[in-house]
Amino acid sequence: MIKLSIEEKMFPDRVIISDFNISIQKNEFVVITGASGAGKSTLLNIIGLIDTSYHGRYILDGVDVSGIDYKRQLYLRGSYFGYIFQDSLINEKQTILRNLLSVIELKKQKEYHCVILNELEKTGLHGISPETSAALLSGGEKQRVALARALLRKPKILLADEPTASLDNDNKIKIMDILLDYHSHGGTVIMVTHDTNLITNDMRIISF
């Protein structure tokens, strides 16, 4: 599914990744661990086509996506990937519903209402009205809204960058249960984390 070879990825002051190769198969749960500043999040951004400023080659589902134009990059990003980050990136000035609809084309938003309710139920938010202001949610609830948003378009690959870092144990378990459920239904997960307690035997570990 993914074959990525990074010859060099530069930051203004240093090389952050060099001579790195990775292959990821469909329906793998891959965990990327390592010290802070080692380039884990940068790698995730490269995989997710957020960052294309590196020297190397990237094959996604048999297609070379190295150096693709911006329009094609956006299309593949939306077609393949869902994202969840340590910061939920939820707009607190909007309702839960509006946050979720923000990733859906305007002309398709009406047909997604039932899908949204289903995703909220999957993420344990069915007891909260979709019209609730995001500002009223706890940190764990915001992260579950972010995860529901990431899963809304049925991504083939879910990228999770420290998704439980700022959460209490109960919410960590809830987030991991959702990721594991997505994986059990055929999804591919690539997760960056410092928390080794989240790792199970069926996950593949890549140390940076």
Placement of each model-derived feature along the sequence:
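Catalytic Walker B motif of ABC-type/P-loop ATPase nucleotide-binding domains
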Residues: L158-D161
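Q-loop/switch helix immediately C-terminal to the Walker
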Residues: D87, Q94-L106
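ABC ATPase NBD coupling module
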Residues: V65-G82
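Conserved ABC ATPase signature
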Residues: S133-L137, E141
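Conserved ABC ATPase "signature" region
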Residues: D64, E111-S129
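Conserved catalytic motifs of ABC-family nucleotide-binding domains
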Residues: K154
